[in-house]
């Protein structure tokens, strides 16, 4: 008898990093919802059969979705609602007008009553206001009958070549969730992730210039022999001259002191460290440079750092693609969570 595939609804799905991790663990994502069409175009391009809906979750009625698309039963709801409205000014923060997107996630859980939910967010959501927000989130879901567990996970503990921390809340009906143990003893380094990708651009659909050099590269290339999204940025000669002064793993402090103020943010002129996992990939990619080449990472390099397989192709302008990658949950970390959930359900 075939093993049951648990069904998933992904809210605030973006391009689909969380969805991908759950699919890798054997879940079946039935629907994904977001209001950014660029990310949804990428989501649809990489998945046939998943309904990817452009809708404003702020005012979306779960019953409408259930009726319109025949979704009567959802096993797991996943997603990362934006929580920019969370502040620590008062005790009713969670009911603040600006936190309606978070409340919409709660509303969907209340309507569908899934076996489990997984919600991800920024790590400091646990400590803001001495834990007021964390406690309010736990209460919201406890009132719906869930036992809520939470933890800050480090992506590099799960084979992602990136030191990215995310707060994860998991709710189950009858037990606490046991978060996954580390899946790697030695972290995957930036060199492991990127060393087979060339300095210059590759036309979409061209062959890889070299064979994979390590296990991570073999895994990330699995099933594909063509490269996509590896277009290198053309920096000014002056930018190239300045970054050339910064060594592997260095930052602006490696420059002459009179050049420290050339860019206004403290992370400017930072190079990846080839011997370690990368720092957190952001949505702009304007200040972080390759450990060896005098340029910012390509979209494919950033996707590798996030643990997206090379078979996952990003659509849209370069700026949009970078934002899609930077906003995503690393699929390998999502897989570790999903795999653990699969065992428990």
Language-model-detected regions and their locations in the chain:
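Short connector loops/turns at beta-strand edges and beta->alpha or beta->beta junctions
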Residues: 82-84, 174, 286, 310-311
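Class I S-adenosyl-L-methionine
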Residues: 63-73, 84, 88-262
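Proline-centered helix-kink/hinge sites
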Residues: 48, 81-82, 114, 161, ...
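Core alpha/beta nucleotide-donor-binding catalytic domains of modification enzymes
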Residues: 2-113, 123-127, 132-134
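C-terminal target-recognition/interaction regions appended to catalytic cores
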Residues: 217-345
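Conserved beta-strand termini and adjacent loop/short-helix elements that scaffold enzyme active sites
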Residues: 55, 151-153, 317
